[in-house]
Amino acid sequence: SMIEQGWDVAIGHGNGPQVGFILRRSELSRHELHEVPLDFCGADTQGAIGYMLQQNLYNEFRKRGLDKQAVTVVTQVLVDRNDQAFQNPSKPIGSFMDQAEALHRREAEGWDVAEDAGRGWRRVVASPLPVRVVERDSVKDLIDRGMVVITVGGGGIPVVETEEGNLQGVAAVIDKDYASSLLATSIEADLFLISTAVEKVALNYGKPDQQWIAQMTAAEARRHMEAGHFAPGSMKPKIQAILWFLERGGKEAIITNPENIERALSGETGTRIIP
């Protein structure tokens, strides 16, 4: 519906479960095949999920008689090699292991491992902040030509610059909301829309005094975030991503669920956040 209304759209997406599946297949077959590096997992999922989105968009455009095309850009996102996240890897990935296997993988392969909430041991990797979308100019050019662009999938493939200025993949995971925020800023988007599992943002979510929010300013959103209303790993990174977008010149942002995007654009529902 956004595209029918004339919006030029760039689409980001997550890839957590899909990367998990690749890692699991890789672990199960490691006695016969080399394991897939984490940055390659990101690239693989960008291609596969991008293909699915492209195909479904093609079919929907055809159904609606729209003269539009969708294209996927395998997207690298630069991170700072000195980001403190690399000194404190905390993002669990892959399967659970017992302590003996975890310590063996640490010694043999240099993995960082940690016990995960008493359920076993897992590999942990850094989750650094995104600095620059490497393919930004290509994404912007495609949007300007009327393409629907699928990009920064899974937060983008994390890369660092070597001393020579070359790019090199790293074993890390970038938050998809943070990467999408950076992209929205860098292409000077008019609107940053986050599609999630709830129709609106709420204070005291899931409690008897839950309160849905139709609109709030950036200052109000920050105050609510600092008061602990938004859960880490859930709504909090979405609010933080929007705050960064608005602080860097963005005009407005919306949070809603997929089935209500059209109504949210017309102001009927969703949570609108403004500077």
Model-identified regions with their sequence ranges:
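C-terminal catalytic "cap/lid" subdomain
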Residues: S1-P275
